[in-house]
Amino acid sequence: MNRNPDQNTLPNITLKIIETYLGRIPSVNEYHMLKLQARNIQKITVFNKDIFVSLVKKNKKRFFSDVDTSASEIKDRILSYFSKQTQTYNIGKLFTIIELQSVLVTTYTDILGVLTIKAPNVISSKISYNVTSMEELARDMLNSMNVAVIDKAKVMGRHNVSSLVKNVNKLMEEYLRRHNKSCICYGSYSLYLINPNIRYGDIDILQTNSRTFLIDLAFLIKFITGNNIILSKIPYLRNYMVIKDENDNHIIDSFNIRQDTMNVVPKIFIDNIYIVDPTFQLLNMIKMFSQIDRLEDLSKDPEKFNARMATMLEYVRYTHGIVFDGTRNNMPMKCIIDENNRIVTVTTKDYFSFKKCLVYLDENVLSSDILDLNADTSCDFESVTNSVYLIHDNIMYTYFSNTILLSDKGKVHEISARGLCAHILLYQMLTSGEYKQCLSDLLNSMMNRDKIPIYSHTERDKKPGRHGFINIEKDIIVF
């Protein structure tokens, strides 16, 4: 039987807090389930909604001025959400409402509200790069890798983009400046800051408080547009979340990383924004081309990749003094694949202190083998490299998340060989190791190459797990 709690036997203060929040006397079950949330509930109850409404209106005026909605509509949506618990009787939904309201109450002002106040002066820190001089070289390199055969019968996943992306991009530009210790960008927008001729869509970010930021942003969009916003977590992308609207249109995504990982990511400072060092991004692009899907993307739009590649090549030429004369020495390093055990052995003794690198194509197998080694010095760089690295007895152990292309039976394609070398160089950059000679040889090994057809490729590691999501409208959190 669901009875009201006896006010004589229950702590009066806690009961009053819950009663005020729910707008009704809680049932016995509600009281006992919610009493440990009393502190959070009290913060929500005393939260100044008028100031919050003002901040959202200012965010709307600055970043969403073209969205047709009135100030009164925004206020009504906010007040409606902060009173939603009064019409909710499901305990699970009440917990979700409390959790999400708590995020808004405790973080919104510092994360998004701060974007409405006067910004610090922008420190102009751009260098003029002669990207044009690298365009022909980039085109030659990419042409030799343009070997994917497109299967016209293959159904490609559609990536529908929301019309709000341009508004969110405007907000993100300011966010990256205000929060440049906890949020950095990479990808097309970061290269656009170096070369304004680069085209970009949404802004790719790494940050240390991704979940909180995305929840705050989702509510901002909800309060301004009235649309239901859903946050999704993808199991095979590590610490990745994406915001989509109710029609499954992509708005923005983000990878979350630890602060200690953020501290070691190579980065440069441009106009008050930190971007991932283009040298590091170039290595990631070389690694990425081992993925068969990315080669298909290259085949569809080579000029898009050419602009990015030329920009990064010019950056490394200018920054590291790389001479592009075709001197490749021992690059790419020798790679031997064991297809049965799904391990590639890379001979590294010509460049590094460890003599070889065992590259696992199954992450769980690597984790098991590291445990067997009883070694506790592995480095986990999360989504920055999608792998741990361990050096033990002059052997590096690591995981490679992409496909391995083969040019013949049992023979690693040179595109994948370079991708594996780039993966090792990412570790060298992250740990402040030596990489410049190896980088020079790797880039020169991409010059003047003929196209080599793909014989076959290994499959990617299958990632376990389920999709998670936060549905604001339905008060559901599944993670």
Curated annotation (Swiss-Prot):
Listed GO MF terms: ATP binding; metal ion binding; poly(A) RNA polymerase activity
Function: Polymerase that creates the 3'-poly(A) tail of mRNA's.
Swiss-Prot/TrEMBL induction comment: Expressed in the early phase of the viral replicative cycle.
Gene that produces this protein: OPG063
UniProt GO BP: mRNA processing
Binding site residues for Ca(2+) 1: D202, D204
Catalytic EC class: transferase
Active site residues per record: D202, D204
Alphabetical list of Pfam families matching this protein: Pox_polyA_pol, Pox_polyA_pol_C, Pox_polyA_pol_N
Protein family membership: Belongs to the poxviridae poly(A) polymerase catalytic subunit family.
Assembly and binders: Heterodimer of a large (catalytic) subunit and a small (regulatory) subunit.
Entry EC number(s): 2.7.7.19
Paired cysteines (S-S): none
Recorded catalytic activity of this chain's protein: RNA(n) + ATP = RNA(n)-3'-adenine ribonucleotide + diphosphate
This protein's UniProt keywords: ATP-binding, Calcium, Early protein, Metal-binding, mRNA processing, Nucleotide-binding, Transcription, Transferase
Name of the protein this chain belongs to: Poly(A) polymerase catalytic subunit
Residues that, per the record, bind Ca(2+) 2: D202, D204, D253
